[in-house]
């Protein structure tokens, strides 16, 4: 009974879970994990630097790419502290305030990533279907307002779930099933009525997993319809190639996201290792893969990187 009393006080803590069955191999596991985090940080930082410094990529479409890189960087830095301190120092305890803060930024950046990809699909649609009006429709002011609206909407979407969760008592085991704090993981430790929290979380998940992808599919359906009406196959392939990077980024985000949701909903009794691996793929795949996708598929980003690196080498001599 004393445990219940203590866990409802302010100074509670949570216990993070490492990779089950591999506790003795933390140092070895940390090497590839650290490499992935390094790729994410360096890749997204490089893209941001190139977009900021290279005149050849000072175009409106790259403002959305810079938003995506900033979001990926935020997502990486949100999970980095708990994951690496667990693997390097076996520090599994996290205070409730730190856990709630990570919960807020983790879900906020995840929702932001989805919203930015939706905005990028609209950008592709306008560029391909209304090329003559692109500059007048997507002005710098419109893009700036879009970015501000995305931030405000994501913050306002996550805050209610944070406050709803903070008001509840935690009186079950403090053991989380992952190495960071997620809403669906924390809510199962509550010993009170969680119907409101569950319904709100379900509504948010529905919005991110169904509504955003549906709008993206609609935009690409309209793009495809427009492309099929063009004169030559060369024009069709060129238009599709311009959108290929964005399509890959969408798949990299939503396939792991759906996988995590399905695992949480329908495979609750699966091995803890499955849940940990799925969650890590979901949070690491987009920040790691997006810089690679855009640097490989986008020639202007490639040239921008080469110019940036060559200028850097000249200044260092």
Curated annotation (Swiss-Prot):
It comes from the Eukaryota. Disulfide bonds join 99-191. Residues 49-56, 123-141, 220-239, 297-317 are cytoplasmic. Residues 1-27, 78-101, 163-198, 261-275 are extracellular. It is a multi-pass membrane protein. Glycans are attached at residue 6. The keyword Nucleotide-binding does not apply. InterPro entries: GPCR_Rhodpsn (IPR000276), GPCR_Rhodpsn_7TM (IPR017452), Olfact_rcpt (IPR000725), OR51/52/56-like (IPR050402). It is found in: Cell membrane. Keywords: Cell membrane, Disulfide bond, G-protein coupled receptor, Glycoprotein, Membrane, Olfaction, Receptor, Sensory transduction, Transducer, Transmembrane, Transmembrane helix. SUPFAM superfamilies: Family A G protein-coupled receptor-like (SSF81321). GO terms for molecular function: G protein-coupled receptor activity; olfactory receptor activity. Pfam families: 7tm_4. The chain crosses the membrane at residues 28-48, 57-77, 102-122, 142-162, 199-219, 240-260, 276-296. One of its GO terms (cellular component) is plasma membrane. Belongs to the G-protein coupled receptor 1 family. PANTHER family: OLFACTORY RECEPTOR 51Q1, OLFACTORY RECEPTOR 56B1-RELATED. Odorant receptor. This is Olfactory receptor 51Q1. It comes from Homo sapiens.
């Amino acid at each position: 009974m004393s445990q219940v009393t203590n866990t409802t006080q302010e100074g509670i803590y949570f216990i993070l879970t490492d990779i089950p069955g591999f506790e003795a191999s933390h140092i070895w596991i940390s090497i590839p994990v650290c490499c992935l985090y390094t790729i994410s940080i360096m890749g997204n930082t490089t893209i941001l630097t190139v977009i900021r410094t290279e005149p050849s990529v000072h175009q409106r479409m790259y403002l959305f790419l810079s938003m995506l890189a900033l979001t990926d960087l935020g997502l990486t830095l949100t999970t980095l502290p708990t994951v690496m301190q667990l693997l390097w120092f076996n520090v599994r305890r996290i205070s409730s305030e730190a856990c709630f803060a990570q919960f807020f930024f983790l879900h906020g950046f995840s929702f932001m990533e989805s919203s930015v990809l939706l905005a990028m699909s609209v950008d592709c649609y306008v560029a391909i279907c209304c090329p003559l009006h692109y500059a007048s429709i997507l002005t710098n002011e419109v893009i700036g307002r879009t970015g501000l609206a995305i931030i405000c909407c994501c913050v306002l979407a996550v805050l209610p779930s944070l406050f709803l969760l903070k008001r509840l008592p935690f009186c079950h085991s403090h053991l989380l099933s992952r190495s960071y704090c997620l809403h669906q993981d924390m809510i199962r430790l509550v010993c009170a009525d969680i119907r409101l929290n569950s319904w709100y979380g379900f509504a948010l998940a529905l919005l991110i997993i169904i509504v955003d992808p549906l709008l993206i599919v609609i935009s690409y359906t309209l793009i495809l319809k427009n492309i099929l009406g063009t004169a030559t196959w060369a024009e069709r392939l060129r238009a599709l190639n311009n959108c290929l990077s964005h399509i890959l980024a969408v798949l990299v985000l939503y396939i792991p996201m759906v996988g995590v949701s399905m695992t949480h909903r329908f495979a609750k009794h699966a091995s803890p290792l499955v849940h940990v691996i799925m969650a890590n793929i979901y949070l690491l795949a987009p920040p790691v893969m997006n810089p690679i996708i855009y640097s490989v598929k986008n020639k202007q980003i490639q040239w921008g990187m080469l110019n940036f690196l060559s200028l850097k080498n000249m200044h260092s001599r």
